[in-house]
Every structure is written in structure tokens, then in C-alpha cells.
Amino acid sequence: MHLAPHERDKLLVHLAARLARERMDRGLKLNHPEAVALITDHVVEGARDGRGVSELMKSGREVLTAEQVLDGVADMVREVQVEATFPDGTKLVTVHDPIN
């Protein structure tokens, strides 16, 4: 199987998000890369499901709370920008202050 670089990146983000979910299920708090991967995966999969940009910008803020991440992570993640593929093309989705 041959994957383009952007396809490998999407697969890596999905794998990191899956690992983050497994760690959350075990009661662990997420670190910075895990938190960003989980939010990114939420946006990418939401776009694939046909959800709109503004809806994903809002719902991306509801993926994680400050209690679910390690100390300092919420302060480090001020925004997450994701290029996601929508039915009408690729768009940049920015989730501001994603961890509340």
C-alpha cells in the first residue's frame, strides 16, 4: 500500500488519538501531543461525517476539559488548526481555546 505524506500524517494523528482515548479510559490525564491529536481527530472525522466548519469550531472546544489533561497543557494549547476535507473541498478549521 502506498500512502501520500498527508495520508500518513492523517493516519498518525488517528493512531495518536486512539491511544489518547485508551489512556483516558484508564483514568490517565493527557499530555500536550495526545490532547492536540484528540482534538484534531475530532475535527477531521467531523468533516468526514459532513459537519460544518463553524459547528466543528464550537464542538472542538467540548472534546476535553482542563481536568482531563496534565497540569499546564490547557495553557499551552491556545488554538488547534486543522486542514480537514469537507464535501466541498479542504478547509482550515481553527479551534480557539480548545481545552476549558
Swiss-Prot record:
Pathway the protein acts in: Nitrogen metabolism; urea degradation; CO(2) and NH(3) from urea (urease route): step 1/1
InterPro entries for the chain: Urease_gamma, Urease_gamma/gamma-beta_su, Urease_gamma_sf, Urease_subunit
Ribosomal protein found in the keyword field: no
Top-level taxon: Bacteria
One of the record's GO cellular component terms: cytoplasm
Known catalytic reactions: urea + 2 H2O + H(+) = hydrogencarbonate + 2 NH4(+)
Pfam family, one: Urease_gamma
GO molecular function: nickel cation binding; urease activity
Gene3D superfamilies: Urease, gamma-like subunit
Disulfide bonds: none
GO biological process: urea catabolic process
Keywords, comma-separated and alphabetical: Cytoplasm, Hydrolase
EC number, UniProt record: 3.5.1.5
First-listed, main subcellular location of the protein, grouped into a coarse class: cytoplasm
Protein location: Cytoplasm
Chain segments annotated as transmembrane: none
Family indicated by similarity: Belongs to the urease gamma subunit family.
PANTHER family: UREASE
Binding partners and assembly: Heterotrimer of UreA (gamma), UreB (beta) and UreC (alpha) subunits. Three heterotrimers associate to form the active enzyme.
HAMAP family: Urease_gamma
Stated name of the protein: Urease subunit gamma
